[in-house]
């Protein structure tokens, strides 16, 4: 017996330990304290250096201990890695400054919690970039010709490549871009801005054969006509940086316009270089340039800096080239990133702030309370129906959320936790209880036939397995499509949903089964009390199918009509932009209180506040983002509500959307392909009529949810993209459970008519439908009552989705399946082999 559960126990322990290791450390340690903890060699010397660095910060000679230590190491050529011998650096890296950079970045990252908080919970850094014309290959190009929107898209791609999740990037006015990065501090990472604003203009120049790698630049009078001085850096044998100079032809032989890919690679000496790959046009140009200049040095210049000048030994016709230089791994990755996403405008930093969290303490506390209450209500709800089984479901929920957080924190994922993200996890947990409910309801049916508790346990898991598998696979198809094709929030939702599917399966089929087996198999538990509800019902659901179908689609068309009538009015600031007001103040007020004052009785539907501290001067201002032409209204409202604060309007800017059209487009494409994937999978696993029913029901639920959301005069913002997509998962999950039971009843009941089979399947799954919906409704209603803002909108969306999903499973999906087959089970059997299977023919053994 114990051998049957030993592997489950071992797997559970390994997964939970792995999740724990991913989440450690749980709290941030101040950098200087972390260095004291981790240093294992020459500690006394390091402690003195830390004290000196702290003194520099106190004297305002450095922004942080992190920066001060790097300065000291550079000035005095101290290799800081000697204090941390356990940290392995690149073996080929001899330059002390770069070794210290890599070491300190690693230690800084290790000092922070694995799971980072978003802008709403912790804040971050914000800066404004101003675009101006840029000279490329001798031609002046203007900002208007190149469009600011493209620059916003490119910066977004670069931010994603840096591993920063949930950023805000949007145009401000006609020539500025605002970037907000959660969990980032320019005090510790000042290079982040330069990486994002680097144009990445790559050009190839011939080097004068007589004036290459000189110790000093040529005097201007001695420069050959058409040539300019450029410097390049290298290291000598001791690791000291050495600068040499080349006379480089001013006009490039070709540029990097035709590069289709760049990526870092390791050379034969263990150093890093960048491999470039050209398209056909670029490959021909490069072959022509190298073929015509065999024996010459070809300088590779990026943003006016000469990185390398290799000699052309032969014509290069392979369509690729390498940039060699003194690259660290990080530098190679960053350069590859910017080369893959080149900017064609010059970006200058005009403002730089540390940003406070956008949610006030009161809002955060009320949201935390709501999450705790909703989770407690969900557990209580399950305990009422399943007693000890509810305890097991609650333990499974705990394991589920712990593993989800562990996956989010793992290297390579490193997701940022925001308040809407927490709401999504809480709601996902409420929905994930469905697997346990399916198992318990099946066990209840088996116990009613007189089976022992042990036999009911095995049969319950076996019979629930197909429904759990198919419902999760269809949802997984949706998630993978969003992950692969989506952008921004859509891609992020696809990743999160994929994680949730696997953790839910693990919690239900491994953890819950393990706990039940430990309690039942040794005989500790003789009975499993479960409260029965909606048992032996005989409702004729198909009787109301036509009327329900017409009524619900009428509501859908009304909702779609309202959406069409309102047009862009259904979108919030994230999608259409708005006003950004800079407000000076004398006394800070909690941003939650400011939001309430700005939106109550003023006609303002949306207002977001955040305190920002300008780096350098330390000046603090309040930034408010609201709808177009509402900035003045907001300022008047908060001035009236808080006269003691001394609020004054310091300026208003128009801001663009933070969610680009590409994200909306990717969401629509992902949904369309997901629906096609669902139909094909269901048709393969069941039959085509099932696929039609599932897709039509899902479309119904999406349109109904959007329509009702708009009818209640709510607006769509970035977090709502994920909430709407979540409805697809819930809707198809509900429908598949019903279809799985229909398939089973058709196979086991050869005499019943198709109408009787459908009604029987709907009645048999009714208790599960109501209990699953009830757990999610409890969570949604609690969040709606207690929270505000995006969390409230997400909860409201799921409330509608649960109600419409339950309705469509009963009155849309099944009637469509019934009408598709013209009410004749022979039509079903002609399209799918569902020959009856009887118990005496040998059912498969329950899996371990």
What spans do the regions from the language model cover?
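Pore- and gate-forming transmembrane helices of large, multi-pass membrane proteins
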Residues: 155, 358-378, 397-398, 431, ...
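Extracytoplasmic
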Residues: 118, 129-135, 142, 149, ...
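Small-residue-enriched core segments of transmembrane alpha-helices in multipass membrane transport
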Residues: 12-19, 391-412, 422-432, 493-508, ...
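Cytosolic juxtamembrane regions of multi-pass inner-membrane proteins
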Residues: 430-471, 517-524, 714-771, 812, ...
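Interfacial helix-loop-helix hairpins and adjacent transmembrane helices
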Residues: 1-16, 22-111, 506, 510-561, ...
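Interfacial segments of transmembrane alpha-helices in multi-pass membrane proteins
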Residues: 2-4, 275, 281-300, 361-417, ...
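Hydrophobic alpha-helical transmembrane segments of membrane transport and translocation systems
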Residues: 12, 399, 406-409, 445-555, ...
């Amino acid at each position: 017996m114990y051998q049957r559960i030993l592997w489950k126990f071992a797997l559970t322990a390994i997964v939970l330990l792995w999740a724990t290791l991913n989440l450690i450390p749980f709290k941030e340690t101040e950098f200087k304290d972390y260095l004291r903890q981790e240093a294992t060699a020459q500690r006394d010397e390091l402690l003195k250096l830390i004290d000196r660095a702290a003194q520099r910060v106190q004297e305002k000679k450095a922004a942080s201990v992190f920066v001060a230590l790097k300065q000291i190491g550079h000035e005095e050529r101290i290799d800081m890695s000697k204090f941390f011998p356990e940290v392995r650096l690149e073996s080929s890296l001899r330059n002390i400054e770069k070794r210290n950079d890599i070491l300190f970045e690693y230690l800084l990252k290790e000092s922070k919690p694995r799971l980072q908080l978003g802008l709403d919970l912790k804040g971050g850094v914000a800066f404004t970039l101003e675009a101006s014309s840029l000279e490329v290959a001798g031609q002046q190009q203007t900002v208007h010709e190149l469009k600011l929107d493209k620059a916003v898209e490119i910066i977004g791609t670069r931010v994603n490549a840096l591993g920063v999740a949930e950023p805000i990037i949007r145009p401000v006015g006609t020539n500025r871009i605002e970037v907000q990065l959660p969990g980032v501090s320019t005090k510790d990472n000042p290079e982040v801005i330069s990486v994002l604003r680097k144009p990445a203009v790559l050009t190839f120049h011939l080097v004068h054969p007589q004036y290459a790698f000189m110790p000093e630049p040529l005097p201007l009078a001695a420069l050959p006509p058409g040539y300019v001085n450029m410097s390049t850096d290298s290291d000598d044998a001791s690791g000291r940086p050495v600068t040499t100079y080349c006379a480089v032809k001013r006009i490039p032989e070709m540029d990097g316009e035709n590069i289709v890919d760049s990526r870092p690679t390791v050379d034969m000496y263990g150093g890093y270089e960048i491999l470039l790959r050209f398209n056909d046009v670029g490959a021909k140009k490069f072959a022509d340039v190298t073929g015509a200049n065999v024996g010459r040095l070809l300088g590779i210049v990026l943003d006016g800096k000469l990185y390398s000048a290799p000699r052309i030994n032969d014509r290069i016709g392979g369509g690729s080239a390498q940039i060699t230089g003194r690259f660290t791994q990080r530098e190679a990755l960053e350069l590859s990133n910017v080369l893959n996403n080149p900017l064609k405008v010059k970006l200058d930093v005009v403002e730089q702030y540390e940003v406070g969290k956008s949610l006030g303490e009161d809002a955060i506390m009320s949201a935390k309370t709501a999450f705790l209450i909703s989770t407690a209500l969900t557990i209580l709800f399950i305990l009422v129906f399943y007693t000890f089984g509810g305890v097991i479901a609650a333990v499974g929920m705990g394991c589920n959320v712990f593993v989800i957080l562990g996956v989010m924190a793992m290297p390579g994922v490193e997701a940022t936790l925001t308040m809407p993200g927490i709401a999504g996890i809480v709601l996902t947990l409420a929905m994930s209880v469905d697997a346990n409910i399916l198992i318990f309801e099946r066990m209840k049916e088996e116990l009613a036939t007189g089976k022992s508790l042990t036999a009911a346990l095995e049969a319950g898991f076996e019979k629930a397995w197909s429904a759990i598998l198919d419902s999760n696979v269809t949802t997984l198809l949706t998630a993978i499509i969003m992950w692969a094709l989506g952008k921004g929030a859509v891609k992020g939702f696809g990743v999160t949903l994929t994680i949730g599917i696997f953790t839910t399966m693990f919690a239900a089929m491994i953890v819950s089964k393990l706990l039940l087996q430990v309690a039942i198999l040794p005989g500790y538990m003789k009975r499993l009390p479960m409260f029965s509800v909606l048992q032996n019902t005989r409702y004729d659901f198909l009787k109301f199918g036509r009327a329900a179908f017409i009524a619900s689609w009428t509501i859908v068309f009304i909702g779609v009509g309202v959406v069409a009538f309102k047009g862009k009015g259904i979108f919030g600031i994230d999608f259409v932009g708005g006003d950004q007001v800079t407000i000076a103040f004398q006394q800070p007020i909690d941003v939650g209180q400011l939001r309430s004052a700005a939106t109550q009785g003023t006609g303002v539907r949306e207002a977001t506040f955040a305190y920002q501290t300008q780096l350098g001067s330390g000046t603090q201002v309040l930034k408010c983002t609201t709808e177009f032409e509402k900035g003045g209204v907001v300022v008047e409202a908060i001035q009236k509500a808080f006269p003691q604060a001394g609020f004054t309007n310091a300026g208003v800017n128009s801001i663009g959307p933070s969610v680009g059209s590409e994200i909306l487009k990717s969401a629509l494409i992902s949904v369309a392909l997901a629906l096609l994937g669902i139909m094909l999978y269901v048709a393969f696993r069941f039959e085509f009529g099932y696929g039609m029913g599932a897709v039509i029901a899902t479309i119904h639920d999406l349109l109904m949810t959007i329509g009702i959301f708009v009818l209640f005069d709510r607006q769509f913002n970035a977090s709502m993209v994920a909430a709407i997509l979540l409805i697809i998962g819930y809707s198809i999950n509900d429908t598949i459970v019903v279809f799985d039971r229909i398939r089973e009843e058709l196979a086991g009941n050869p005499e019943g008519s198709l109408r009787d089979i459908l009604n029987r399947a709907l009645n048999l799954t009714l208790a599960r439908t109501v209990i699953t919906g009830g757990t999610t409704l409890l969570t949604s209603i609690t969040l709606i009552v207690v929270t505000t803002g995006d969390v409230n909108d997400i909860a409201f969306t799921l409330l509608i989705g649960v109600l419409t999903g339950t309705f469509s499973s009963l009155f849309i999906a099944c009637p469509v399946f019934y009408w598709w087959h013209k009410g004749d089970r022979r039509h079903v059997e002609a399209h799918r082999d569902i020959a009856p299977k009887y118990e005496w023919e040998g059912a498969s053994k329950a899996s371990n």
